Amino acid sequence: MSSIDTPANKLQAKTLFHPEHLEYINKQLSELSPQDILKWCRWTLPSLFQTSALGLSGLVIMDMLSKMDMNVPLIFINTLHHFPETLDLLEKVKTKYPNVPVHVYRCAEAANEKEFAQKFGEKLWETDESRYDFLVKVEPASRAYSDLNVLAVFTGRRRSQGGERGSLPIVQLDGPVLKINPLANWSFTEVHNYIITNNVPYNELLNKGYRSVGDWHSTQPVREGEDERAGRWRGREKTECGLHSHPQSKFAQYMAELKKKETADQ
């Protein structure tokens, strides 16, 4: 069995939540505050994790959880191409929230950026974007979800971020996992104010004009009046990373292809 297979005895969100059920849940949760959504998740969902690249929204969720004594484990995908400031922030987060277990996953075939370039070529994100996303995000996330038996994950996505996130529900199925977006209704201003008011550590790049921070090669500061994610993949049609593409993320597509292959081999 490969590291990304899903044994029959593991819970899968898609077997527990049907579309009609999710529609009803979304209607109920849409009236709740983020904190109450987090409480509902604690009462309702086993094997609950947070996945975050340590953007402002993810940090808000982590702080809210900590204040409610909900030490939900964090999954951090090290793409090997993060800014140094992002990796510095990870260490600050560990210090600020010592009771939160942190699981770091990275590409299975390279330990650092230099090894990655040697194995897959320079600037793979330009020559084969889909393969790059798979190697540094999709496969590590798939492995994390399998290793940790993840049923549901908190994400920091918000409708105000625009693009594919404009119609984001509170909860949604993505392959075998349930994704919960407790800050879906919040604006950038609300998120930023929470960070400052509650003294939550944040990425120092935000002091240099950045608002949404991803890999160093695909992130730029935003200009006055631009959407907060305008600095991501500037000049390209892409607006979403490989983990959250709509209607089905590359992670979900990958798991579906894997299942199809297993069935054919039987």
Swiss-Prot record:
Phenotypic effect of disruption: Leads to methionine auxotrophy.
Transmembrane segments: none
One GO CC annotation: nucleus
Stretch list, region Disordered: 219-246
Pathway membership: Sulfur metabolism; hydrogen sulfide biosynthesis; sulfite from sulfate: step 3/3
GO MF entry, a single one: phosphoadenylyl-sulfate reductase (thioredoxin) activity
CDD domains: PAPS_reductase (cd23945)
GO biological process: cysteine biosynthetic process; hydrogen sulfide biosynthetic process; methionine biosynthetic process; sulfate assimilation, phosphoadenylyl sulfate reduction by phosphoadenylyl-sulfate reductase (thioredoxin)
EC number from the UniProt entry: 1.8.4.8
One Pfam assignment: PAPS_reduct
Enzyme class: oxidoreductase
Keyword terms, alphabetized: Amino-acid biosynthesis, Cysteine biosynthesis, Cytoplasm, Methionine biosynthesis, NADP, Nucleus, Oxidoreductase
Function: The NADP dependent reduction of PAPS into sulfite involves thioredoxin which probably plays the role of a thiol carrier. Required for methionine synthesis.
Similarity annotation: Belongs to the PAPS reductase family. CysH subfamily.
Protein's recorded name: Probable phosphoadenosine phosphosulfate reductase
Organism: Schizosaccharomyces pombe (strain 972 / ATCC 24843) (Fission yeast)
Protein encoded by which gene: met16
